[in-house]
Amino acid sequence: MNKFEDIRGVAFDLDGTLVDSAPGLAAAVDMALYALELPIAGEERVITWIGNGADVLMERALTWARQERATQRKTMGKPPVDDDIPAEEQVRILRKLFDRYYGEVAEEGTFLFPHVADTLGALQAKGLPLGLVTNKPTPFVAPLLEALDIAKYFSVVIGGDDVQNKKPHPDPLLLVAERMGIAPQQMLFVGDSRNDIQAAKAAGCPSVGLTYGYNYGEAIDLSQPDVIYQSINDLLPALGLPHSENQESKND
């Protein structure tokens, strides 16, 4: 049974929705922290920082690393470190290092979630234009989509550097709807985090929240999307298509 009426396009978030990018992001964050002689965070912690773009990711990483370093030194009976470099400058340096390292590990550290390719293919075959809206820095987006063999499904791709205001601001979603030539209420937006759902609500788009993403450790139902699914292929019956049961490995 269709849950959505008059949907003429579908747009997706990337990290935590279509792809598990945490391994690559965490590796790059830790390499950048290590280069500045700061404690490394690990994937489990970095996952809670993903979703607001690279600059915010660096701010969260630096804040945690400075606090962690202070705690470690206090435990060892050592005096605190006086940072000669202001935090804002350290964030800028950390971001530069992160970009370099992430460029090296992004493809090998990013995997499609199950059923993503089948679902995108089924929606495209139905004739629905598909869009991508991500806060990820734009230079990383196209190469990653190509490496994962899903670039072919999207008619509109908006990266984090393509708009002045990133999600949760509605501008990226409004831009995608405009380029699709449809009204915002005719574009379904699918994401895994409160930023995604807030952006969809602000833009006037119906929303789907997926339970398996990152979302800062919060349950997606707290953001009150219109519908919550555990798997991305649950979209298909909601849009009048048969449910795909094809299995995909992370490396497909």
UniProtKB/Swiss-Prot annotation:
The active site is at D13. GO terms for biological process: carbohydrate metabolic process; DNA repair; glycolate biosynthetic process. Monomer. Pathway: Organic acid metabolism; glycolate biosynthesis; glycolate from 2-phosphoglycolate: step 1/1. The keyword Transferase does not apply. One of its GO terms (molecular function) is metal ion binding. It comes from the Bacteria. InterPro entries: HAD-like_hydrolase_sf, HAD-like_sf, HAD-SF_hydro_IA, HAD_sf, PGP-like_dom2, PGPase_prok. NCBIfam families: HAD-SF-IA-v1, HAD-SF-IA-v3, PGP_bact, PRK13222.1-1, PRK13222.1-2, PRK13222.1-4. Gene3D superfamilies: HAD superfamily/HAD-like, Putative phosphatase, domain 2. CDD domains: HAD_PGPase (cd16417). GO terms for cellular component: cytosol. Mg(2+) binds at D13, D15, D192. SUPFAM superfamilies: HAD-like. Keywords: Carbohydrate metabolism, Chloride, Hydrolase, Magnesium, Metal-binding. It catalyses: 2-phosphoglycolate + H2O = glycolate + phosphate. It holds the Pfam family Hydrolase. Its EC number is 3.1.3.18. It comes from Shigella sonnei (strain Ss046). Specifically catalyzes the dephosphorylation of 2-phosphoglycolate. Is involved in the dissimilation of the intracellular 2-phosphoglycolate formed during the DNA repair of 3'-phosphoglycolate ends, a major class of DNA lesions induced by oxidative stress. Belongs to the HAD-like hydrolase superfamily. CbbY/CbbZ/Gph/YieH family. It is an enzyme of class 3 (hydrolase). Its cofactor is Mg(2+); chloride. Transmembrane segments: none annotated. This is Phosphoglycolate phosphatase.
